[in-house]
Amino acid sequence: MTDPELERIRRKKIMELQRKLEESQEKKVEEEREKKALEEAQRRAMLRRILTPEARERLARVRLARPQLAQAVENYLLQLAQTGQLKEKIDEDQLKRILKQVSDATRKEYRIRFKRK
């Protein structure tokens, strides 16, 4: 084989390997996206079972204003449900109490100090 022919074969092989690598990376990203979507759907279904419609609505409004708080409350509620500590659906008043508890537990305290000269 001549040098130009070897170089052409090498380039072709490199291009093929790069294409395969890109395809596998795209496939991994797509699988991860599907996995996250499935997990989120399962979370929503579980929350639908343990919250009344009014409580779900309130949690949705909280999610708009304070996403981290809503996420923490959802995790707490799902944990309670998975351990069997919930005997009935959570209504809006119970959710308010839970929101306050979680908010108080996760709230950061800020101090403002003035330096006077």
Swiss-Prot record:
- Originating species: Methanopyrus kandleri (strain AV19 / DSM 6324 / JCM 9639 / NBRC 100938)
Q: Which family does it belong to?
A: Belongs to the PDCD5 family.
Q: Name one GO cellular component term.
A: cytosol
Gene3D superfamilies in the cross-refs: PDCD5-like
Please list the GO terms describing molecular function: DNA binding
Instruction: State the UniProt keywords alphabetically.
Output: DNA-binding
The taxonomy runs: Archaea, Methanobacteriati, Methanobacteriota, Methanomada group, Methanopyri
Q: Which InterPro entries does the UniProt record give?
A: DNA_bind_arc, PDCD5-like, PDCD5-like_sf
Q: Enumerate the HAMAP family for this protein.
A: dsDNA_bind
> What is this protein's record name?
DNA-binding protein MK1619
